[in-house]
């Protein structure tokens, strides 16, 4: 029986002291989130071993990053590996988690390249939950594929180049508040923070004046003062990297507005930089730097295409008072968490399960209904017989093209609880097809049936598939293999050698997160004329 653990510790070394109270409310939200998954569904399942929680958390979310990983709720031992800057926050967790035996959570502080690498390469580890950069996530994926022992799951949340669109119907005061909160709160050191703002050109002049005025009202200083709005970035290395980006924009004449930087400390002043579009951002700038682009009214779909083309898909914001536009944009944007007429940070798990897609993460969403099963052991049936021949690459590509018809189709829509005046919906969208590699036709058929039963798309192999094809084949979301460990390791290594999103080798039964993206849409219903559901209920 899956074991449910009690409340989380509240405590967060925020980029400003006032933010502690806000972040603490998020910490609390993570604690009961597992309750949204009926635990009776997991009677008889087993934990899949000790799990490494490998969190490269920047100063605002150390406790939350811990609490959004629930292997301990699935009866597993947990080893926390924290970066050296945030050891104290993890000590709070290791010492004070309510009701957890001493040997269940173990804190191993130290640098990722030493402690973390040793943990990930250990064959006794049953899974890894990681928050950090794409580069490090890729390195972990390769290490897991190359080590001895069973193939184990990796859940990665890897940030993004997050955008917001403001059209000419948006309420300017509301939009500016949402932008300032999204871009500059916690000194921009949230994976969900706003990086690229698109403003309709009809309103850009007056809107920019209002935005820069709001920036001028921000107070920079020590995080311990309640009056502080923006504190320092995490360290001097981060400060110098961000400062170099700002200096390049200044040299190119694209610096639109910048606050005065304090004389001491690792501060970066909130900064506004002009860009032609999101494609100008080659990487995420993890700090209080906002990039502004404009668009014409008939270019909305082109803007959406540009945002999707980055390959990232974590958070997205929209400011508009046109309901049809809300529907159109949220139907087309490929992002895990979308926010309408509010800021795009501070997801409340249980109402807003959090996590991205593509380059922004593997899924399933933290705090969502499909998260806990990933930490359980879903044993595959007895392995099938070996293939007698090989499947050609051309045949695989043809089958993938046919199977991916209807990709991104919404399979279901779940209404989640939330405060009055806010709508929260979680939708499931079909991923690219899963390759069902057998071995053997009967096994491949059983794999495909398991995928389709979850709403996913599948391609059944008709012969042996060479491992190196998994490195170059496009149009799939991973592979199922219920055969020998040696061949499975070759498949895992081929998938880990890919560039782009992390794709899994599944050696047990597939789960919902393997076959579907989860996309959440949060709407401030008061911004478009009031809460119709509330008014209707009162009548």
Describe the role of every protein-language-model region:
Residues 1-98:
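N-terminal secretory/targeting leader peptides
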Residues 7-14, 98, 107-109, 156, ...:
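Short beta-strand-to-loop elements that line the ligand-binding cleft
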Residues 12, 31, 110, 130-131, ...:
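Short beta-strand and adjacent tight-turn residues that come in two discontinuous sequence segments
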Residues 70-89, 93, 203-210, 302, ...:
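Short amphipathic alpha-helical coupling segments at ligand-binding clamshell hinges
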Residues 99, 115, 121-123, 127, ...:
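ALDH superfamily catalytic-core signature
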Residues 102-105, 433:
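Short acidic capping loops at alpha-helix termini that bridge into adjacent secondary structure
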Residues 264-269, 283-290, 310-314:
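Conserved glycine-rich beta-strand-loop-beta hairpin in the small C-terminal domain of fold type I
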């Amino acid at each position: 029986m899956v074991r449910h653990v009690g409340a989380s510790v509240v405590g967060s070394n925020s980029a400003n002291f006032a933010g502690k109270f806000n972040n603490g409310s998020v910490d609390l939200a993570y604690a009961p989130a597992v309750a949204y998954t009926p635990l009776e569904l997991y009677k008889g399942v087993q934990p899949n071993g000790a799990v490494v929680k490998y969190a490269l958390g920047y100063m605002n979310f150390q406790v939350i990053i811990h609490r959004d990983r629930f292997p301990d709720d699935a009866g597993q031992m947990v080893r926390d590996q924290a970066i050296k800057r945030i050891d104290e926050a993890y000590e709070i967790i290791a010492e004070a988690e309510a009701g957890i035996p001493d040997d269940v959570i173990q804190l191993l502080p130290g640098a990722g390249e030493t402690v973390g690498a040793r943990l990930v390469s250990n064959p006794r580890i049953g899974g890894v939950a990681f928050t950090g950069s794409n580069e490090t996530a890729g390195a972990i994926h390769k290490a897991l594929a190359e080590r001895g022992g069973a193939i184990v799951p990796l859940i990665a949340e890897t940030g993004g180049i997050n955008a917001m669109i403001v059209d000419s119907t948006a309420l300017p005061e509301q939009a500016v508040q949402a932008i300032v909160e999204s871009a500059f709160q916690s000194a921009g050191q949230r994976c969900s923070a706003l990086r690229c703002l698109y403003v309709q050109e009809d309103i850009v002049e007056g809107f920019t004046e209002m935005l820069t005025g709001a920036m001028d009202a921000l107070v920079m200083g020590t995080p311990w003062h309640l009056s502080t709005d923006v504190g320092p970035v995490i360290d001097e290395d981060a400060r110098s990297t961000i400062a170099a980006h700002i200096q390049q924009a200044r040299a190119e004449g694209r610096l639109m507005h910048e606050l005065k930087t304090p004389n001491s400390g690792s501060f970066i002043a909130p900064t506004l930089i002009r860009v032609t579009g999101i494609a100008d951002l080659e990487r995420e700038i993890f700090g209080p730097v906002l990039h502004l682009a404009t668009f014409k009214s008939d270019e909305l779909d082109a803007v959406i295409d540009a945002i999707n083309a980055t390959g990232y898909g974590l958070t997205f914001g929209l400011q508009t008072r046109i309901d049809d536009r809300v529907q159109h944009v949220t139907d087309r944007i490929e992002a895990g968490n979308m926010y309408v007429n509010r800021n795009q940070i501070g997801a409340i798990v249980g109402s807003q399960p959090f996590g991205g897609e593509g380059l922004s993460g593997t899924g399933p969403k933290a705090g969502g209904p499909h998260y806990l099963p990933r930490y359980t052991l879903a044993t595959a049936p007895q392995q099938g017989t070996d293939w007698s021949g090989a499947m050609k690459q051309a045949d695989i590509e043809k089958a993938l093209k046919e199977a991916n018809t209807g990709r991104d189709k919404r399979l279901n829509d779940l209404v989640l609880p939330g405060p009055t005046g806010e709508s929260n919906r979680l939708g499931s969208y079909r991923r690219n097809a899963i390759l069902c590699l057998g071995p053997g036709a009967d096994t491949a058929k059983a794999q495909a049936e398991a995928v389709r039963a979850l709403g996913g798309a599948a391609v059944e192999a008709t012969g042996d598939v060479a491992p190196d094809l998994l490195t170059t084949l496009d149009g799939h979301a991973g592979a199922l293999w219920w055969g020998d460990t040696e061949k499975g390791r070759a498949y895992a290594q081929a998938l880990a050698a890919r560039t782009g999103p992390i794709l899994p080798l599944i050696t047990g039964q597939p789960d919902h997160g393997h076959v579907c993206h989860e996309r959440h849409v949060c709407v401030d219903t008061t911004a478009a004329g009031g809460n119709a559901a509330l008014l209707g209920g009162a009548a």
